[in-house]
């Protein structure tokens, strides 16, 4: 497929000043990556898409001015996102370069046009390849690489006057700079600045860049060096994970209402299924009351027909470290967790299977996050021990109120995860799978929804 997107203009947004300086121990305007940052260096950038539509959208030039001026104001507070991932000399550490020369380059801001109508843009939900063209490109195969890039795309059937009908804002952020929570904190602040002129609205917590709590761990330096030897043995070149072939993928998005989620939790809970503990081999103490939204929805996804099945997911560690990291920490602070079950526990597809899947997720979180960094020297060993054909990888942004992202012209009609790090991935509840697997997954997934109010 050829490109459906034409670049109209590309510029750089620069912050006039920095209002949130780096920690005192960060010399030379550089933030040394922690072991948790280094772990994500080979990953493709995180990419998010926000679809806005309606007659209330401002003319495209006015919309661009609002986004650019508010981005500049936000970068003054989120300084590392204006910098670059780079190699420091002579230590050969990978750092976020926030020096004046790096930050002064600004964040690349692309204005683009989609070769189709507003209605065409609405129908892109199942087209992974088209989605990839709506977000800016960040190539992570060699350092330095910018931390952030932005693209704003309009359909071709609009002009610069009046309401434009639809627009898509795409954001790409290098995963080595921060995790999903870091990205969403930035996007929330940017939207607040667009609405009110400043990201520092009531309730705003300035981002924290200090990685000392993580870097002080006795195994931190050795593990970080191990990650670097594997992911970047010939700095500044990077062994980036290859992009999955989007032409082989199918994409689906499913909407679960709040009522359906409540009903799902009630179905899973043994207290609402009196015979579950005795009839399905699930002790009453095994499944928490109630399961979290994440565990409940994950149980819908995680059904398999392998001898052993694994669910891989990242879990936030900020509140679980000792001392804890603040919620506003701008960096990576997640751990890859593994839930395990057998074919017999998952394959019946009934309420019992859902309960066992939810229980396994909750138990994995309890065990593996009690001391998040205690087994850090075994993470690679554990990951390599999981058979690649026996796991489902899942991610979630449900805690981040994505549909509250209002830049001043209302909430988005759709928010999508455009980056997929592996060939098959589930983002609650947008699904990317091999095309041959999608129909079977969809039939099973929808059958599990039967009976939800």
Question: Where are the regions that the model predicts?
Answer:
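Long, contiguous juxta-domain segments that are non-catalytic but functionally important
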Residues: 1-36
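A signal for specific C-terminal beta-sheet/loop modules enriched in small/flexible residues
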Residues: 2, 113-116, 121, 125, ...
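Generic detector of low-complexity/intrinsically disordered segments
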Residues: 10, 24, 150, 237, ...
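Soluble acyl-CoA-dependent acyltransferase catalytic core bearing the H(X)4D motif
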Residues: 15-19, 28, 42-43, 47-80, ...
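Short, surface-exposed beta-strand/loop micro-motifs that present aromatic residues
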Residues: 37-39, 147-154, 423-428
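Low-complexity, glycine/alanine/valine/leucine- and proline-rich hydrophobic stretches
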Residues: 390-453
């Amino acid at each position: 497929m050829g490109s459906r997107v034409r670049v109209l203009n590309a510029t750089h947004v620069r912050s006039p000043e920095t209002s949130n300086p780096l920690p005192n121990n960060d010399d030379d305007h550089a933030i040394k990556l922690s072991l948790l940052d280094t772990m994500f260096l080979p990953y493709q950038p995180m990419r998010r898409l926000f679809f806005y539509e309606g007659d209330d959208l401002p003319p495209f030039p006015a919309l661009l001015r609002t986004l650019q001026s508010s981005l500049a104001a936000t970068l003054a507070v989120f300084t590392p996102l204006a910098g670059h991932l780079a190699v420091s000399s002579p230590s050969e550490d990978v750092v976020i370069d926030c020096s004046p020369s790096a930050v002064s380059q600004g964040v690349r801001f692309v204005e683009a046009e989609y070769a189709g109508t507003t209605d065409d843009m609405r129908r892109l939900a199942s087209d992974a390849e088209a989605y990839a063209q709506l977000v800016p490109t960040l190539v992570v195969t060699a350092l330095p690489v910018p931390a952030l890039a932005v693209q704003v795309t309009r359909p071709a059937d609009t002009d610069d006057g009046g309401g434009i009908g639809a627009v898509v804002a795409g954001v790409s952020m290098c995963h080595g700079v921060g995790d999903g929570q870091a990205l969403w904190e930035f996007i929330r602040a940017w939207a607040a600045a667009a609405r009110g002129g400043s990201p520092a609205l009531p309730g705003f917590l300035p981002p924290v860049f200090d990685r000392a709590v993580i870097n002080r761990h006795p195994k931190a330096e050795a593990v970080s060096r191990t990650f670097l030897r594997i992911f970047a043995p010939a700095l500044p070149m990077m062994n980036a994970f290859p992009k999955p072939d989007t032409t082989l993928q199918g994409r689906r998005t499913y909407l679960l209402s709040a009522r359906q989620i409540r009903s799902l939790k009630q179905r899973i809970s043994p207290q609402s299924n009196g015979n579950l503990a005795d009839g399905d081999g699930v002790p009453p103490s095994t499944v928490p009351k109630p399961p979290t939204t994440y565990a409940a929805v994950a149980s819908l996804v995680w059904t398999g027909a392998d001898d052993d099945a694994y669910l891989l997911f990242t879990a936030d560690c900020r509140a679980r470290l000792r001392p804890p990291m603040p919620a506003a920490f701008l960096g990576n602070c997640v751990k890859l967790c593994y839930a395990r079950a057998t074919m017999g526990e998952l394959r019946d597809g009934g309420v019992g299977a859902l309960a066992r899947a939810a229980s396994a997720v909750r138990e994995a979180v309890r065990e593996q996050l009690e001391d998040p960094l205690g087994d850090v020297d075994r993470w690679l060993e554990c990951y390599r021990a999981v058979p690649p054909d026996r796991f489902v990888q899942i991610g979630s942004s449900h805690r981040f109120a994505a549909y509250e992202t209002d830049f001043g012209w209302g909430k988005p009609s759709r928010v999508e995860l455009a980056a997929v790090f592996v060939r098959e991935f589930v983002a609650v509840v947008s699904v990317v799978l091999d095309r041959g697997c999608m129909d079977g997954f969809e039939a099973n997934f929808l059958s599990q929804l039967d009976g939800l109010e």
